[in-house]
């Protein structure tokens, strides 16, 4: 079955796996893992990674060139709307007018849970300034609807806390977000292994974004390959339509035509 492309804002993608660039041991490992993942969208923490703002330091864009990948600047490390907006403005300047960004405004350093109030405030400002916003948010369906109605081009509810590896803790609420949404819904944060990614896709999500699950694996390149396959398998399972759940057994062999009785 031929799948449709993933449409985010004005852009089209074949891969439904998005990856980050943090926590790798060096740029070579980053490069190899991203290649193994098959990802087309690579997210970069502007406040933590050099993409040209520090000319004397290694530039991440040397291994993820914008000609090959869609660079998705993110506002990781921002705890209020003003700093998130400033970070997006810097990203646009560094990337020659690039308007697609991932907005995340965090509530505290312990949980890195989204600060929904500041997220809404930043999203409104950035959308008014012409940005296309992919937004990290809680798994609250009402907040997700509000962000979509404001004009965000993708909703990114957390599966569980960033970097926790706890998987998809609230599949039911994420399913509700997906059912209500007219823009792509991508699970962001909490994926720990391939089965978590597959579950997110089986729920009907349009994609999965991850970083630590790959970078913190014992073999990041092999895990990146596993995640690619998991996202593809989960997507195919969703499109195929799973069998209904039943309380009792239902034999798979016919009940007539036995050779022996």
Curated annotation (Swiss-Prot):
Subcellular location: Cytoplasm
UniProt-recorded Gene Ontology molecular function terms: thiazole synthase activity
Active site per database record: 102 (schiff-base intermediate with dxp)
Annotated positions binding 1-deoxy-D-xylulose 5-phosphate: 163, 189-190, 211-212
GO biological process, one term: thiamine diphosphate biosynthetic process
SUPFAM superfamilies assigned: ThiG-like (SSF110399)
A GO CC annotation given for this chain: cytoplasm
Catalysed reactions, as listed in the record: [ThiS sulfur-carrier protein]-C-terminal-Gly-aminoethanethioate + 2-iminoacetate + 1-deoxy-D-xylulose 5-phosphate = [ThiS sulfur-carrier protein]-C-terminal Gly-Gly + 2-[(2R,5Z)-2-carboxy-4-methylthiazol-5(2H)-ylidene]ethyl phosphate + 2 H2O + H(+)
Chief location: cytoplasm
Pathway as given in its UniProt record: Cofactor biosynthesis; thiamine diphosphate biosynthesis
Protein keywords: Cytoplasm, Schiff base, Thiamine biosynthesis, Transferase
The EC number(s) this enzyme carries: 2.8.1.10
Top EC class of this enzyme: transferase
PANTHER family: THIAZOLE SYNTHASE (PTHR34266:SF2)
Family indicated by similarity: Belongs to the ThiG family.
Function statement: Catalyzes the rearrangement of 1-deoxy-D-xylulose 5-phosphate (DXP) to produce the thiazole phosphate moiety of thiamine. Sulfur is provided by the thiocarboxylate moiety of the carrier protein ThiS. In vitro, sulfur can be provided by H(2)S.
Record note on quaternary structure: Homotetramer. Forms heterodimers with either ThiH or ThiS.
Name the UniProt record assigns to this protein: Thiazole synthase
Organism: Acinetobacter baumannii (strain SDF)
Organismal lineage: Bacteria, Pseudomonadati, Pseudomonadota, Gammaproteobacteria, Moraxellales
């Amino acid at each position: 079955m031929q799948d449709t492309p993933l449409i985010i804002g004005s852009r089209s993608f074949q891969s439904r796996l998005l990856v980050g660039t943090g926590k790798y041991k060096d740029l070579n490992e980053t490069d190899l893992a991203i290649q193994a993942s098959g990802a087309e969208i690579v997210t970069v923490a502007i406040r933590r990674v050099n993409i040209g703002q520090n000319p004397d330091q290694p530039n991440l864009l040397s291994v993820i060139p914008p000609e090959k990948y869609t660079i998705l600047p993110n506002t990781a490390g921002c705890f209020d709307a003003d700093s998130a907006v400033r970070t997006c403005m810097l990203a646009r300047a560094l990337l020659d007018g690039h308007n697609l960004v991932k907005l995340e405004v965090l509530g505290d350093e312990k949980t890195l849970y989204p600060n929904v109030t500041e997220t809404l405030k930043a999203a409104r400002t950035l959308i008014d300034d012409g940005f296309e916003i992919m937004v990290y948010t809680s798994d609250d369906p009402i907040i997700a609807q509000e962000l979509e109605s404001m004009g965000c081009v993708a909703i990114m509810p957390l599966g569980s806390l960033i970097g926790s590896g706890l998987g998809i803790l609230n599949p039911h609420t994420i399913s509700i977000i997906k059912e209500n949404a007219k823009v792509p819904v991508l699970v962001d944060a909490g994926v720990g292994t391939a089965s978590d990614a597959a579950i997110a896709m089986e729920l009907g999500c349009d994609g999965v974004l991850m970083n630590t699950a790959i970078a913190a694996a014992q073999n990041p390149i092999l895990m990146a390959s596993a995640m690619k396959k998991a996202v593809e398998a989960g997507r195919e399972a969703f499109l195929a339509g799973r069998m209904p759940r039943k309380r009792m057994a239902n034999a798979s062999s016919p009940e007539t035509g036995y050779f022996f009785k």
